[in-house]
Amino acid sequence: MIKEILKKADEKMGKTIVALKRELASMKAGRANPAMLDRIEAEYYGSMTPLNQLGNISVPEARVLLIQPWDKSALSAIEKAILKSDLGLNPSNDGTVIRLVIPELTEETRKNIVKTVKKTGEEAKVAIRSIRRDCNDDVKNLKKDDVSEDDIKKAEDDIQKKTDKYIKEIDSIISAKEKEILSI
């Protein structure tokens, strides 16, 4: 029973790290990255469809994203979706492809992005601590099942070690992203 709780903690904490990495990948860092467009959806034949399912997204130059839709009729919908997004990019539609030029980041913009990165990191840490609390509650409930105090204490220590490991990983991911943003 304790092993299952520890496994559940590991899985949930791992998913939190994956979600954090995905979230950070979509943040602008002054260079083109197709992941920036992952959360943008365009209306296509009546339903909202992610841009990466509407066409090919490539990076021909360091600060240029090129979107080649498989269906040319989707060009205007893709353009509207990009304009509505919070990325602040101006799409250039030439009738066959959409070009997105990623502007140079100002110092102020960089600092704002770093603040957002730190906030996102803190949210991930809160999620990890919440998972720790839930797992510790599950372990404490095992007292009813005649599990020894020593086993419960050891399980709580193991959960704390996992928590510390994942929080340390979050810190390193956040500091790497900050360096990436500030060094460009």
From Swiss-Prot:
GO terms for biological process: translational termination. CDD domains: RRF. InterPro entries: Ribosome_recyc_fac (IPR002661), Ribosome_recyc_fac_dom (IPR023584), RRF_sf (IPR036191). GO terms for molecular function: ribosomal large subunit binding. Coiled coil: none annotated. Gene3D superfamilies: 3.30.1360.40, Ribosome-recycling factor (1.10.132.20). Keywords: Cytoplasm, Protein biosynthesis. It is found in: Cytoplasm. The keyword Cytoplasm applies. GO terms for cellular component: cytoplasm. Belongs to the RRF family. This is Ribosome-recycling factor.
